[in-house]
Amino acid sequence: WTAYAPWAAGTLNTVDYLLICMLPLFCAKLANSIFVDLTSYKNLMISKNKILGVMNEPEETGSMEPLQTATHEITFDSVDFSYVPGEPVLKHATFTVPDQKLTAIVGDSGSGKSTILNLIAKYYEATGGTISIGGKPINHVAAERVLEQVSMVDQDIFLFDDTIRDNIRHARPNATDTEIEDACREANCDSFIRKMEKGYDTPTGENGNLLSGGERQRISIARAILKNSPILLLDEATASLDIENELAVKQAIANLLKEKKTVVMIAHTLSIVKNADQILVMGDGRIAESGTHEELLAKGGKYAAMWNAEQKISA
């Protein structure tokens, strides 16, 4: 409207008048472009800092010699660990996971249960003490060699943006299609896969977002079955599933445990670990109690209190 009067009076030509009218649009477009560029720059700097953080990490050390042991007993000897300096998660944790037995770990949230699995898989290095597999300390063994001996089924399942078949094949790249399908039958996922339009060639989407939580969990178990490692780590595999999927996953885990393996299982409900060969009860970063279900109930300690509380809730 400011330019309308001069234009109407003939003192402003039509081209200039149109340019003035369009000026706010140009300014808005420029402001939007600047905002997009600044956002891109901010994201670029975040990515740059993350990359530099990885590059500045100490180079991984350890022998690349295969980890060959007669047994797969796991021993923690006075192990300490902190994610943040000065805030210990594990404090002189000492225990043994017997070879080819099922050991369950229970305890309060944040007591260090998942940390134990991460240290066994060598996702992190212990800040003190010694972790051994088959009597051989893994402190100076490359993480890659340790992971060759380990299969892990975690709460948060990572899947590649690939087909179901190839996601499972990542566990053992030379596996045949028949071996993959056999593993899926054991993991209770063959039936739902075959119901899909493309079957085993169905894309999972980025990080498996085209599948439900229970389906992702069973595919992860199929990978563990296919890999057939001597050590199996299970981290609260049924923690966030509905009843139907939880039952299917529990059956898949039961099939997985048929083979003689050294198994360490974390569970949020005690009922699924009461038949374990050994139960470790975590408390304040240490092993507060250990024993079988019956032995721990007889002690009348932390485990017995947790069991009684769970029974009251389910009654």
Located regions from the model:
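Cytosolic ends of transmembrane helices, especially the final helix of ABC transmembrane type-1 domains
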Residues: F26-V54
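Conserved E/DxxT/N motif and adjacent residues on the DHp alpha2 helix
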Residues: G53, E60, R169
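Hydrophobic alpha-helical segments in the permease module
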Residues: W1, T14-V36
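ABC-type nucleotide-binding domain
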Residues: T69-A315
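Two-component histidine kinase transmitter core
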Residues: E57-P58, Y124
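Juxtamembrane "helix exit" motif at the C-terminal ends of alpha-helical transmembrane segments
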Residues: W1-A8
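Pre-NBD coupling/linker segments of ABC/ABC-like ATPases
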Residues: P58-T69, L296
